[in-house]
Amino acid sequence: AQSMLDEAGWVVGADKIREKDGQKLNIDLLYNSDSVTEKAIAEYLQSEYQKIGISLNIHGEEEQSYRDNMKAGNFDMVFNICWGTPYDPQSSLAAMRAPVYGDYAAQLGLEDKAEIDQAITDILVSTDEQKRQDLYTFVLTRLHEDAVYIPLTYECNKAIYRSDLKGFHFTQTQYEVPL
């Protein structure tokens, strides 16, 4: 990462923060302060970015403020999760087309945002599985190439219940508990 920043003209200043054309390399990371996990990851990233000369300013906000700022695009970087099985990939992709989550704002700078949105719409209405697969490949490849999303972790759900409770199990999603 350091050599890539060097090649791009970002020089380490006296304060150990890189700068280019008089501009410091500062990035704001927004996280949900109600999430212990997000705070820990934000602090870790801040420490790691500092080692390569990037000032990562972390901002924890209570959940509603966090969500409002995500929708408005008031962030440089933000945490995001997908919904998982059985909702994805279609649910996460569908949500990218409207300003309801940070995805929409994060993608606004993409040259082919309209084409990506149309491909997502086509995925949702097509019954041709090969066409859908081709469209998924297009969308996910474009988002990967532009590094819009950087996978960091996968959080497992945990549950505690009494050992004498029989016939109880969890589904693949945290949103359903069969009774």
Language-model segments: residues:
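Detector for C-terminal structural segments
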Residues: A1, T37-Q46, R67-L179
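Append "and occasionally in soluble cytosolic enzymes with long acidic Gly/Pro-rich linkers
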Residues: A1-S47, F138
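Structural recognition of the beta-strand scaffold that forms the well-ordered cores
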Residues: I27-L30, N57-G60, M77-I81, I150-P151
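Short strand-loop junctions, especially beta-strand C-caps/beta-turns
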Residues: L30-D34, E61, S126
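Short alpha-helix C-terminal cap/hinge motif
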Residues: L45-L56
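Short helix-initiation/N-cap motifs at beta->coil->alpha
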Residues: I58-D68
